[in-house]
C-alpha cells in the first residue's frame, strides 16, 4: 500500500512531516513501513502508516526513531467528517493492520478521537507536548519567564547564532548532552545523517549553532517543519558552556525563524513528559497539547512478561 500512501501524502499537505512517505523512508531502520488505507471512488480517503519490526519470534508495530507521532489521517476535502464517518473510517483502517504480537503508536495531536481503537481492544495513555501559537512575537517574548529573558540577553552578548552548518556538529553537541547525563544516545550517526539529508532535500529543516568569538560551539539545535507547524527536534549543549544561556537563545531564535522566515503560526517543542524539561517549556509560555499513546498486546507471552 506504500504507493497509494505516497499519493495520499502528495494530495494532503496537512499530513505532518513525521508521517510523510519520504520521512518514513529515511527513519525506518531494522524494519519496514507500510500503510493501511481506505479507498472510495478511486481516492484514498483515510490512511494510517505503521512501522513493522521483528525481534526473535515476535512481530510488532512500533515508533521509528526521530518520529514524534503517527496515527490515522483523513483526507481533507470540503466539510469535516462527521463523528459517524470518522468512526467508520478508523474502524476500516484498524481492520487492515497486520496481525502482530504487539502494537504501540503515538498519535498526532490532530487526532482527538481514539474510540474506534478502544472498541477493538486497544488501550491508551495521555501524553503531552507543549506548543506556542505565534500570532504576535512581542506577546510571545513578553510571556517568557524573566530568568529566561535574562539568559537570552546574556547569550546575545557572548555568542553569535549561525544557521546552516553541518549535521556532524549537531551530533557531537547532542552526544555531549547525553554523556553528561550518563545516558546512551538512542541513535547512531549514519541514521541521523540519512534523516537529515531527507529533511534537507525536502527543505524541511534548519540547523542552528551558537558560537563564541573564539569559535567554540556552545549549543546546537535542529528545527523541522511541515505546512502547518515547526518542531524543535534535536538540541544539545556543551556541558562546560551550559551557563552561557546559548541553548535558551537558540530556542528563541528557532521560534523567531518559525514566524519570520517560515511564516508559520505553530511551534511545537516535541514534549516533554520529563519533569525538568517540561518546566522549561512552560517558562517559554508554551501550552500543553495532549496526544494519545495507543497500544495493544496480542501475545500471551508478552502480556505475561509485561506484568
Predicted segments, located by residue:
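Conserved acyl-donor/pantetheine-binding loop and adjacent beta-alpha core of acyl/acetyltransferases
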Residues: 54-71
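Aromatic (often tryptophan-rich) hydrophobic motifs at membrane interfaces
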Residues: 75, 91, 195, 201-306
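Conserved beta-strand-loop-alpha-helix junction that forms the acyl-donor binding cleft
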Residues: 105-113, 269-276
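Short, conserved charged micro-motifs
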Residues: 79-85
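Short, high-confidence coil segments that cap the C-terminus of an alpha-helix
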Residues: 31-33, 99-102, 205, 262-264
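Short, surface-exposed amphipathic charged segments that create phosphate/polyanion-binding patches used
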Residues: 144-147, 303-307
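A conserved beta-strand-loop-helix scaffold within acyl/acetyltransferase catalytic domains
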Residues: 1-41, 47-57, 108-243
